[in-house]
């Protein structure tokens, strides 16, 4: 089976967008993920407004043949206004991106679905999909919640994004993943981590954003997850390792992540 691989932003978060593309090409990735808006309260990333950086990034994409799989990140809260994400969508289209990573911060799932549908209406104008990622500390906590939002929204370009870490630390099951309608998953984020019973909010967020493990080095059932997803799913390596970044370059970390996942696949 021939998989396609994408280098996620968090794996090489210390690299600039052009550097991330170059690293992806050097390591043998097919795609790259780029962050334009922050996950927290930081300022927007330079790629969103810096025309020179956009030109440099597009030039490297063209030179290497690497393509942008996804851009990050849209957060849907109770007061969500999709119009404020127009600059993100426009930039994504200029980069040739395919997917937008979406987080659901509203635990009123019906309201979240309405907002998700409105965002999908905008995204489709830029030939982008909206890929909803359940995270256990957000309003959309698990696979069940995400599917409810997507199905209620009823948008043709609305998809679910599975993150191996969040899958493992929520009450989601492999059976739920395997039952997802064909064509509703574009990509899955792979990493590993130790098993923790009843993790705290701080543990959930710290591991997710700072210290994950290479695929195969922890206790997540990654082989089971591979078997549960469609064969044409893009596999994204999302392995932030801030401690190891002190002595390993971004390219070394990207290479290790890809090699680890390929070993797991066999």
Where are these regions (language model features)?
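Active-site beta-loop-alpha junctions enriched in small/polar residues
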Residues: 8-12, 35-39, 73-76, 104-107, ...
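N-terminal small/glycine-rich loop or linker at the start of catalytic domains
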Residues: 1-6, 67-70, 74
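Surface-exposed, active-site-proximal loop segments in enzymatic domains
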Residues: 41-48, 74-89, 202-209, 245-246
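Alpha-helix-loop-beta-strand connector modules within alpha/beta enzyme cores
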Residues: 50-69, 121-126, 220-227
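Histidine-acidic metal/acid-base catalytic patches
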Residues: 1-9, 13-31, 58, 62, ...
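Active-site acidic/histidine proton-transfer and metal-coordination neighborhood
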Residues: 60-67, 75-159, 169
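Glycine-rich, proline-tolerant flexible connector loops at the mouths of alpha/beta enzymes
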Residues: 33-56
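Hydrophobic residues within beta-strands of alpha/beta enzymes
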Residues: 32-33, 71, 100-102, 130, ...
